[in-house]
């Protein structure tokens, strides 16, 4: 067995849709699978392995579904979420409390079982939300390296109108420090995450996923 071979897991949501993130994930996962054991753990149940040439690749797939039952856990998490967002100060202690409700305990158990069952060397969270899932269970994962791969800009997450993570800067900062690494797509974003949230990030630019053909019209 090749001693340099690694078992790598990408934890992602929509894998088989039409989008930039899906395309980039496919390019990188397929390239890595030439020399490593690569699996994508997806919440996407609309499986279509013909997308992006997955069916002809060595990339493996696992799936996970979170059942959102309106049980006692659901309402307890709702209460904690309300308190954190509307009443409590935002600090390290309250961020830890909010982590309980952001990703429900029953969901955490599911994800821990999936990840630890695969005996992976590295796990990569695709997108901020799924990276936060991994951060909340980092101490319980038997994995050497857990990394966040953030595809949204700092402004899109926190500053623009209708940001993806409104009012969650403190929570994001505290949770992400649990991870072994954070990857962003630009040096400017790396600076913003460092200066505003105290998070050290590495910059890895997305690969070219479309091959340009011909010359662009001067009209554009």
PLM region descriptions:
Residues 129-132, 145-164, 181:
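A short, histidine- and acid-enriched strand-loop-helix "catalytic/donor-clamping" loop
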Residues 188, 207:
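Carbohydrate-associated surface elements
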């Amino acid at each position: 067995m090749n001693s340099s071979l690694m078992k790598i897991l990408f934890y992602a949501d929509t894998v088989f849709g039409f989008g930039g993130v899906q395309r980039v994930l496919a390019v990188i996962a397929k390239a890595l699978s030439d020399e490593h054991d690569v699996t994508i753990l997806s919440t996407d149940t609309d499986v279509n392995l013909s997308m992006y040439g997955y069916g002809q690749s060595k990339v493996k797939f696992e799936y996970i579904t979170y059942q959102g039952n309106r049980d006692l856990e659901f309402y307890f998490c709702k209460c904690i979420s309300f308190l954190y967002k509307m009443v409590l100060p935002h600090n390290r202690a309250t961020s830890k409390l909010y982590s309980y409700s952001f990703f429900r305990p029953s969901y955490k158990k599911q994800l821990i079982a999936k990840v630890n069952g695969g005996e992976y060397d590295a796990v990569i969270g695709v997108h901020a939300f799924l990276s936060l899932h991994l951060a909340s269970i980092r101490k319980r994962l038997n994995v050497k390296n857990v990394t966040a791969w953030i595809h949204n800009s700092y402004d899109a997450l926190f500053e623009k109108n209708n940001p993806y993570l409104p009012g969650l800067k403190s929570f994001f900062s505290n949770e992400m420090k649990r991870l072994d690494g954070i990857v962003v797509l630009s040096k400017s974003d790396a600076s913003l995450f460092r200066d505003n949230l105290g998070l050290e990030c590495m910059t890895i630019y997305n690969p070219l996923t479309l091959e340009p053909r011909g010359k662009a019209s001067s009209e554009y």
